[in-house]
Amino acid sequence: MSHGVFAYTWDLVGDPDAAARIAGLGADTVTLQAAYHSVRGITPWHPAHRVVHAEHAAAYFRLREDRWPGLRPLAPTWGVENPDRFGTAAAALTAAGLSVEAWLVLTHSSAVGSAYPDVTVRNAYGECYPYALCPSHQLVRDYALTIVSEICAQYDVDLMLEACGWLGFDHGSHHEKTEGADLSTTARRLLSLCFCPACRTALGAEADRLARSVRTAVDAELTGGHPTPVDATALLAHRGTVIADLVRETKSLAGDRRLLLMATDDPWVTGPDVGVDFQSVAPDAFVLKSWGDTAAAARQLKSAAARTDIPLIANVTALDPEWNGVAELLEAGATEVRYYHAGLASKARLNRIRTAITEARR
């Protein structure tokens, strides 16, 4: 049974003790940031910096100029300077006896979306979500697949995919001001449906009717009325087809490498964990977010295990003060665990990860 931890490249590059510290947790695998969205993170252990502000989404692997004919990720300018941060960090982890998974965020990039708004998600009101690249567009699919192919061409690592589909309304933008409207889960999901030109083309005549019904339902809720149900079957089916095709193409590029997919089996879900029918896609493992209430996470794992023979990996967070280990998740059907996050965790939280791994292996 594999126990792995998440880490950022800046946790390792410039810190000669980082790989040994991670290995000392008892982990056998590190899910290492290779293409990632903007973030501000603390680095409790690094000898050269304490706060890293990744101002935009970036590729942390070597960017070969001739491989990007369309959309192109940006390079990072923060942390310890290095022309190949992913490769340097991965080499240190491998030398410490750890396996490496490239952590690839595919369709979440405000930098690319702001430069190319025509390929971003647009809600039923025609409003652009610049952080959300829409994979209905061939340019976006090519961008995602080039990220994967470049990792496979340059490094001998497995792959974990985040945001392998649509992002939606829920994002957490800078100085977010949306909570006062008391939006229901249903309204948030309706505001996450995409009506960009590519999605409209896929839907055909259905697009106008659906967009109109979404606007009517959301407006009714916002004004205190009673929204009527919205039938988005055709759009959800379109999303499922695009995601399944993208996973299949990624799997082909991966070859013998393991392909792990952050996912949920609710087709309405958008975000880091793509909403898919577990019967329609075939990664080597599904990674299920098991944050928050452990009992609820265990029920989710048990339900998923009943519907697929593909292995399930529990993604747990040691950053949650209520986190109480993984025994219940393993009993529910998880075959592996990934712990978030070795670089962000305090000494006490690292000790909790170490204890959880030790107890799970008894």
Residue ranges: model-predicted function:
Residues 3-13, 64-84, 127-142, 232-242, ...:
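The substrate-binding groove and active-site-proximal loops of carbohydrate-active enzymes
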Residues 11-24, 138-151, 267-281, 297-300, ...:
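Short, acidic/polar
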Residues 16-47, 52-57, 150-158, 276-288, ...:
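Catalytic domains of carbohydrate-active enzymes, especially glycoside hydrolases
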Residues 29-56, 82-125, 160-168:
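Glycine-rich, aromatic-flanked loop segments that form ligand/cofactor-binding clefts
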Residues 32-40, 162, 215, 219-229, ...:
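Aromatic- and acid-rich polysaccharide-binding/catalytic face
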Residues 126-253, 258, 263-277:
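Polysaccharide-binding and catalytic clefts of secreted carbohydrate-active enzymes
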Residues 218-232, 304-324:
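Active-site clefts of carbohydrate-active enzymes
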Residues 283-297, 308, 313-361:
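Substrate-binding cleft of secreted/luminal carbohydrate-active enzymes
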